[in-house]
Amino acid sequence: MPPCELISASNGASFQLSDLYFPSFLDLKQFVGETFHISVDDILLLLSYGIILKRSQWDSTKIRSEGLKSIYVFDRKLFNEDIELAVEERFRLFKPLDSPMSDLSEVDRNIVLRNMGWLKALQSDVEFFQLSIEQTRKEVQNMLDCGVVMLEYLKNYCHEVETLYNSHVGFLNKLHEHSASSQWREVYDSVLEAVKIDQQRSLASFFQIDELNQIEAKIRHTDHELNMKLKELKKTIDTCYQHRKTLVSELENIKSISVVSPDCMDKQMTDKFNEMAQELEAASNEWVQNSENNDHISEKVKQMKDSHIPNLQTISQSLFNKASKIIETKTDMQRQLRSLYISVAKSQMDIIEVKSTLTKDMKSDMKLLQTYELQLSQVLDLPMCYGLYLIELYRQQLWMDNYTHIKDQHESALQVMLQEEIHQRKMWYRDFQWISKFLKVDQSLPSTVSITPLKALRRVDLLQINEYFNQLSSAKVSETTLNVLKSKLSQAEMDNMLPELSEQSSNDTGAAIEGYKSRIKKLENLLLDAQFQRYDSWPSGILNKEIAMVQMFRNNTLNNKVQRSSTDDISNSIQQSYSKTLGDVQNLQKAISEYSGLTDTLKEELSTLKSQISNMEVEKNAYKESMANLNKELSNLLINRENFHTEMMERSNDFKKHLALVGEENEQLTKQNQQLSNEIIESQKKYEELNKIKDDLLLNMANQETQAEQERAALQEEIESLKKEVGQLQMAKSSLTESEELLGINKQLEKTLYDVFQGSIFLLESIGLLLSKDIDGKFQIVRVKGLRKDLDSSVIDMNGSLVKSVVSHEIKDTFESIKDSLDYKPHENFISYTEKLFGNQLFEMAVIRRFNDIESLAKKLRKENKNKKILLQKYTNDKITINNFQLGDLALFLPINDQELLLNSSVSSLNSSFSSIDLNSSTQSMIPPRVIPNRVEPASNTNNSNPSSVPEDMGSPNMNRVNTMGNVKVNANIGSNNSNNNYVNTGNANGNNKPETNIDTTSSTNAESPKKQIVWAIFTATNTEVKYILRNTMSNYELLREKEWAVGRITALEKNIVMEGARNPFKFPQNTVWFEVDALFNLS
């Protein structure tokens, strides 16, 4: 058997397991991980045809005996696109070096020795190149085999899911074929409603029509969902199938690109290389050993240097290129296969989702649909089930009648036996009463015998069953159902025939037994009369005890003999009648057993036929499936054949094209050869002519030697002069080319310098600096205000009219003048501008100074903004808000009472302007009028009818507020910007600062006399429709007691709208918006 081989899908490496044994599957995985440097958890092992190797399938001896050839090893990281796997180079190839003799004209001993070392290294390299080509070709084929196995694995997995999907579809189709959802309503209306089970009820009374409708709706909904899910899954399966076909085509493309067939030229080149290397090595050794004595060997080595060494280098270079190319092909194929494996993983994830849906969601939905169908099928099965129910009741009734009849007979027989036993015990007790003194004799027996009767069942007769059958027939129930019910009825009647037969036979036997019993009783009576007639049979006393006992024994013996004889006669007659009856019963039982055996045989044959039919169906489906698979494989083979033919045609066309190219090259070489031959012929002709001329010249040489020498010298001088002129022309041409290139570079540099110069000028003007000239013509950069006014900061137009610098226009004119000028002075003038601006760091220092000024200005402005921000924040914290109050605002709180609202005076108007409330009544606490001494003004100064008496400086820092408290006017100085606010406390006329009464927060009904009620409200200057009232708490009003005004920061706002049923303690009009406010006061 061939050894098993491990093949890695990552790089195509392989390892043979010829003599290795792995007791467990884990040992195999650990060996694979150590061999191919893969983590044990990431190893996936596949067999041929895409079968996964699992722990349960591993048996080293069994697999070895079965002849397992290959195990394909996959690293699970290959299927994860998030993990980058670097392509590992198992070895590197180095380009062969040139021979040390190739560039030398003379050869010595050292050169030959060095060349021999070079030849050994070259032989090793060529051998390595050949080995790497063969090994890489095998690894490429192994990787392609792994790709095929992976696609087979995906195909098997998809086929498994497709089979599961087809089973679900088949199950659903069977449910549709036998579905009760489309039939139950017709059966319910035409059969269940028509068939009556009594005078008031029909079969339809067993169901609730609403529940049946709900079940039908559930069936339709569930069936619709299942169909939609199956359609979606079908789309996914079809997509995976198409994706799988795409992957197969991609693998075929990879094969067509990557497969490198063995080339016979490699072996021929290697053999030729070895042959030439051996010849060169032998000649070199011989030359080294005999270099001083043999010129022939030296000449041979030199010839080999010119012929063998170039060929050796060419062959080694060819093998090197081929090895490098096949390694590069392998690397590209690794990347392509990695993308293929990632696509396989994605396709498998899609099919796994399909499988999960089929095994979980679809399975539960199928069970639910089956349950609903079974519930509706009860409507279809109820007519037959109810008929079977009636037949079962009828059968039980027949059995109950037989049971009752037999029970009554046995009760009468047992009653006779009981009476006889009672009589016998009385007789014995009468004869042997004396022994009861010594022994306990139990004489107790029940007086009657009774068998507990069974509970009575519902009475059903054949008339009711036949009437039910007639109703089913009139309701057009199928004949199959009626035939089944009639057969069950016949079977029930046959089941109760055997007990009747046994009863008849038992009646005959019982009559015979009764006759024999009567005869025995008569004989016992005659015997008893005979005993009474003999005096010696009477019981004796103590004196004649032995005689009496003996006599009694004799009498008992006689009685036993008589009784035995009579019993034998009876038993013989009973035995005869019983044997006859038993024979009849045995005949009947034999017939019944024959019929039952025949029935069992028929049932077995029927079950066998059914099983054969089911097996044939299974085989049929298997044949269909196998035919489908064979058709698929056949189509794949046809596709492969077409692809193969196409590939062969392409190769044939390529070969023909190659032959045509070779033919064309051959023709061209032939033409060249012909041309060379012609040239050789012409050269020979010329040579002959030259020979003739030579002869003529030799003849005339003596005469014209002096003249020729002079002409030669003149020609030599002319040649020398011409050579000098040619050299000068070549130097001029090269210098002209270089000068043109330098001129182009110079123009580009000048353009760049011009752009930099103009950009620098624009940059200076954008920061307010102007480049100008002084009296001496030197550049200077000065600060000019308003220079940036006309510049656009977002657009730089260095050629526009926005630039103000005179130097910019000068250098622009200079640049325009030197574009086509070849004079170097304008160019030097142009460069001088750049040196003046950048040579002495004038530009850098000006920009740095300007930015330092801007930075100091920015720091100054930042400091001023910070101070302004702190001052603004302080002002914001100290300001008093007069409208649109929010949490944290500082507000002015003022007291007001209900009496002020009733006065039509300037004071009430003033209070209305100051406060945001309008009270008709109040539930607040009442305080007495407060008087401020030494601050009373004449009443005439207050015009009650003129509202203009309100002061106009309400918003000023020092504000005078007029508040009416009785007939006294109070002035309050409010400083909003001062840290210590001046509050005015009011007291009574006696100068006491204590108020006359305290704030009462319990109830206003406890006041002894009507007093002014007061609340605290926020001052609003613009919007008087919204009311802001301080919450009535003990802390607030205790804190503000004896205060005329207060400033507090709002901590809470509760919005209220006056509506019917809403809280309105101040009797505001409807739809009035008012806020209940909490505040924090600073009264220090």
From Swiss-Prot:
Major localization class: membrane
Pfam families attached to this UniProt entry: ATG11, ATG17_like
Subcellular location, record wording: Preautophagosomal structure membrane; Vacuole membrane
Record's compositionally biased regions (Low complexity): 940-949, 973-993
Keyword Transmembrane helix: no
Disruption phenotype: Impairs the cytoplasm to vacuole transport (Cvt) pathway. Mislocalizes ATG8 in the cytosol, when ATG17, ATG29 or ATG31 are also deleted.
Location of region: Disordered: 925-961, 973-1007
Ranges in coiled-coil conformation: 585-739, 847-879
Signal peptide positions (record): none
UniProt function note: Involved in cytoplasm to vacuole transport (Cvt), pexophagy, mitophagy and nucleophagy. Recruits mitochondria for their selective degradation via autophagy (mitophagy) during starvation, through its interaction with ATG32. Works as scaffold proteins that recruit ATG proteins to the pre-autophagosome (PAS), the site of vesicle/autophagosome formation. Required for ATG9 anterograde transport from the mitochondria to the PAS. Also recruits the ATG19-prAPE1 complex to the PAS. Required for the Cvt vesicles completion.
Subunit text: Homodimer and potential homooligomers. Interacts with ATG1 kinase and the ATG19 and ATG34 cargo protein transporters. Interacts with ATG9, ATG17 and ATG20.
Protein's name according to its UniProt entry: Autophagy-related protein 11
Organism of origin: Kluyveromyces marxianus (strain DMKU3-1042 / BCC 29191 / NBRC 104275) (Yeast)
Higher taxonomy: Eukaryota, Fungi, Dikarya, Ascomycota, Saccharomycotina
